[in-house]
């Protein structure tokens, strides 16, 4: 695995707090209130500055190659705010942290639901070194089916204020069966509002029942198959199965074969992931609070992890255990110790 001097980008989960209840997010269960062991916390400006010392800042600051055109390379970001559980707009020191980073010459990318704070707050983030990706999954009548508790009109208002202040915005669209027919309308609206780009986000989580905070069935996401019932099972039955399926040894992954080719995002992108409690991981896929959170990918990581809190020990020491993750790829299967997340997210299919 990589050493600190190899790192050129850091993904940061600034907070585990969120104003939304996306049904496929690990911070709840299908929209219902459920915490499987993550801390409710965030990084302050002082703590952030402690982690991002001068050495790390020098490494993630983009320098144009010698002889290149002197304009900014817009696709390189030294810091990406894109947490597993929380949303940037819920962090108390978010604006101050971004201002500090751009003052250090760092390119910043923020991915957010954009549904909290005022328009004036968002306008403060406008800067040539900052791009904000607003998650807008359709129009006003469909957006909230996935981004629960997020008001589409408010997101548009916040994005418009940010753009009018000179901000660079990206429309991030998750396609579902219920909103695919609106994609072109969304593209047209994005262009008319001044978004500089439109991006389709696909992560495979696009189907299942959705529940209220109190566990009552709300609606389905995704079209039902011909043999499927529109009546969902009780939430508790789904939750019990979710909690125990990994423990039953029934994990089946396409890449769980002998000698899999793992294309590690940590190594390819030369990046780290810093969670909201200051702990450090090779990537976001391994950063679901493995010491405390019940998650399919955490059991093996929990065994490998060593002291990794950058608020307690030097950042370089926090990377020392990464080599053990790579060594664990040599296990014969997930059941025998190969990290689940590495196989699920970084397995490369053989070329046919």
Where are these regions (language model features)?
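Cysteine/selenocysteine-centered motifs that mediate thiol-based redox chemistry or coordinate metal-sulfur cofactors
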Residues: 310-352
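Recognition helices and adjacent regulatory flanks at domain boundaries
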Residues: 1-7, 20
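Acidic donor-diphosphate engagement hotspot in glycosyltransferases and nucleotidyltransferases
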Residues: 93-94
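Radical SAM enzyme [4Fe-4S]-AdoMet core and its adjacent flexible, acidic
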Residues: 13, 28, 32-49, 58-65, ...
């Amino acid at each position: 695995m990589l050493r600190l001097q190899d790192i050129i980008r850091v993904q940061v989960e600034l907070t585990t707090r969120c104003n939304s209840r996306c049904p496929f997010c690990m911070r709840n269960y299908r929209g219902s209130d459920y915490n499987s062991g993550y801390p409710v916390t965030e990084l302050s400006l002082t703590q952030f500055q402690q982690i991002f010392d001068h050495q790390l800042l020098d490494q993630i600051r983009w320098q144009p190659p010698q002889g290149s055109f002197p304009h900014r390379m817009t696709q390189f970001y030294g810091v990406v705010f894109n947490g597993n559980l929380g949303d940037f707009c819920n962090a108390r020191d978010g604006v101050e942290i971004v201002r500090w980073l751009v003052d250090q010459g760092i390119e910043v990318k923020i991915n957010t639901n954009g549904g909290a704070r005022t328009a004036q707050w968002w306008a403060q983030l406008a800067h040539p070194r900052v791009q904000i990706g607003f998650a807008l999954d359709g129009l006003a009548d469909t957006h909230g089916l996935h981004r629960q508790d997020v008001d589409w009109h408010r997101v548009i208002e916040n994005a418009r204020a940010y753009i009018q202040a000179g901000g660079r915005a990206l429309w991030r669209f998750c396609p579902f069966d219920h909103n695919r027919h609106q994609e072109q309308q969304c593209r047209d609206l994005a262009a008319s509002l001044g978004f500089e780009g439109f991006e389709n986000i696909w992560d495979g989580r696009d189907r299942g029942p959705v529940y209220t905070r109190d566990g009552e069935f709300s609606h389905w996401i995704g079209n039902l198959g011909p043999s499927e019932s529109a009546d969902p099972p009780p939430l508790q039955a789904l939750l019990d199965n979710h909690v125990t399926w990994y423990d039953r040894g029934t994990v089946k992954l396409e890449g769980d074969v002998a000698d899999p080719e793992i294309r590690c995002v940590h190594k390819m992108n030369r990046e780290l992931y810093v969670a909201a409690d200051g702990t450090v991981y090779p990537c976001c896929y391994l950063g679901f609070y493995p010491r405390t959170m019940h998650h399919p990918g955490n059991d093996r990581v929990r065994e490998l992890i060593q002291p990794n809190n950058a608020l307690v020990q030097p950042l370089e020491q926090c990377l020392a255990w990464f080599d053990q993750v790579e060594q664990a790829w040599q296990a014969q299967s997930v059941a025998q110790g190969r990290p689940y997340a590495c196989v699920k997210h970084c397995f490369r299919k053989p070329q046919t």
